């Protein structure tokens, strides 16, 4: 009887697509990169889902799928290890450059002129996150310190200030201080005449005291908080760490945006 031939023909027709699918899945291919391995694994998975047989064909596909998974895990681990090594190398280089910059910055500050330090920091580009944060913290600090002196000079030009100020040398002067627009010298009216001294000769602590006296006259809350922030950053840039911490602590309780900016200064270890 030829019934078996007809039956075999039906079976062949039924499994014929599996031959094609398996031949395609088992063909030699380039699978060296993560993308190539992922593509091959996807194709094998799709083949496994499509084949109808449950014997040797399926076993071959499942073995290939398992092998590709192992290879994918191995290559992924190698890539991660390579990436970590590259990141470590880059981080060490960034930290070394940051150390050089940090050592150089003080020499770029002349009196209360922070422009050179700001220019240097603005031009720096780092890939390491914590190093970039450290640079951002320093740039924020010096930029705010510059803005502090600008604001104080504007106040002195517009209003003047009366009280006792201390110079860096330790000499104290009591009188009314004023500043002419475009001038870098402070005019101090004292008993018996007027004394002219460079703005940069005043002790940082005295500058903050002068600025705070102007701040107490401010009624706008935004301006008030901004001035307090400038005072805190200037104090830190000038090396008055304790005063800076006190001013910043008070401000952080009331001003959340400042808190996030100040945290960069803290994280930078300034």
Task: Label each PLM-derived region with a short phrase.
Residues 1-73, 77-270:
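Compositionally biased alpha-helical segments
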């Amino acid at each position: 009887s030829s019934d078996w031939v007809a039956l075999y023909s039906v079976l062949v027709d039924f499994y014929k697509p599996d031959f094609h699918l398996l031949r395609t899945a088992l063909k030699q291919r380039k699978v060296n990169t993560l993308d190539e391995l992922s593509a091959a694994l996807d194709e094998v998975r799709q083949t496994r889902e499509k084949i109808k047989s449950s014997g040797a064909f399926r076993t071959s596909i499942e073995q290939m799928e398992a092998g590709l998974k192992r290879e994918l895990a191995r290559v992924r681990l190698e890539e991660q290890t390579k990436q970590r090594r590259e990141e470590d190398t880059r981080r060490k280089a960034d930290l070394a450059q940051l150390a050089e910059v940090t050592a150089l910055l003080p020499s770029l500050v002349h009196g209360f002129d922070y422009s050179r330090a700001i220019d240097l920091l603005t031009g720096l580009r780092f890939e390491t996150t914590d190093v970039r944060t450290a640079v951002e913290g320093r740039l924020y600090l010096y930029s705010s310190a510059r803005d502090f002196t600008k604001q104080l000079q504007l106040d002195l030009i517009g209003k003047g200030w009366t009280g006792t100020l201390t110079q860096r040398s330790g000499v104290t002067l009591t009188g009314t201080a004023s500043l002419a627009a475009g001038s870098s010298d402070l005019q101090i009216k004292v008993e018996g005449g007027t004394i002219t001294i460079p703005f940069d000769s005043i002790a940082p602590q005295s500058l903050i005291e002068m600025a705070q006296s102007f701040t107490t006259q401010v009624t706008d809350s935004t301006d008030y908080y901004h001035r307090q922030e400038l005072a805190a950053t200037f104090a830190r840039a000038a090396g008055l760490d304790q005063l800076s911490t006190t001013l910043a602590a008070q401000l952080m309780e009331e001003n959340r945006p400042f808190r996030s900016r100040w945290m960069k200064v803290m994280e930078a270890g300034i």
